[in-house]
Amino acid sequence: MRVKIALVCTECKNRNYHTTKNKKNDPDRLELKKYCKHCKKHTLHRETK
């Protein structure tokens, strides 16, 4: 079952990206390095609901 998640910038706490993930294949929280338009640099983004 795929669920909707938001990715939050760890530096400025903005929800910049929304995506889906398969909970069966990825039970842990997703962490990706993505570009934050508010910080104007690549930062670590973590999964939240």
UniProtKB/Swiss-Prot annotation:
GO annotation (BP), single: translation
InterPro entries: Ribosomal_bL33, Ribosomal_bL33_CS, Ribosomal_bL33_sf, Ribosomal_zn-bd
Key words of the record: Ribonucleoprotein, Ribosomal protein
Annotated TM spans: none
MF annotations from Gene Ontology: structural constituent of ribosome
GO cellular component: cytoplasm; ribonucleoprotein complex; ribosome
Pfam family, one: Ribosomal_L33
Family statement drawn from the similarity comment of this UniProt entry: Belongs to the bacterial ribosomal protein bL33 family.
PANTHER family named among the record's database cross-references: 50S RIBOSOMAL PROTEIN L33, CHLOROPLASTIC (PTHR43168), LARGE RIBOSOMAL SUBUNIT PROTEIN BL33C (PTHR43168:SF2)
UniProt name for this protein: Large ribosomal subunit protein bL33
Native organism: Caldanaerobacter subterraneus subsp. tengcongensis (strain DSM 15242 / JCM 11007 / NBRC 100824 / MB4) (Thermoanaerobacter tengcongensis)
